[in-house]
From Swiss-Prot:
Coiled coil: none annotated. Keywords: Amidation, Antibiotic, Antimicrobial, Fungicide, G-protein coupled receptor impairing toxin, Immunity, Innate immunity, Mast cell degranulation, Membrane, Repeat, Secreted, Signal, Target cell membrane, Target membrane, Toxin. Residues 28-45 form a propeptide. The lineage of its organism: Eukaryota, Metazoa, Ecdysozoa, Arthropoda, Hexapoda. This is Mastoparan-B. It comes from Vespa basalis. AXPX repeats lie at residues 27-30, 31-34, 35-38, 41-44. GO terms for cellular component: extracellular region; membrane; other organism cell membrane. The keyword Repeat applies. Its main location: secreted. Belongs to the MCD family. Mastoparan subfamily. GO terms for molecular function: toxin activity. The keyword Secreted applies. Transmembrane segments: none annotated. Residues 1-27 form the signal peptide.
Amino acid sequence: MKNTILILFTAFIALLGFFGMSAEALADPLAEPLADPNAEADPEALKLKSIVSWAKKVLG
């Protein structure tokens, strides 16, 4: 039984990856797909965005 649940969960995650869905998209299906990252949902993405914008300013 435990192995069956593990296999089904792994298959579900693989299908999500196959169709290109992220956890944030599943959590907020009404969100604009091209919008900036939600700071509450993904603080790591917000940090990355600020680093990229800083690099753009420094490099021109």
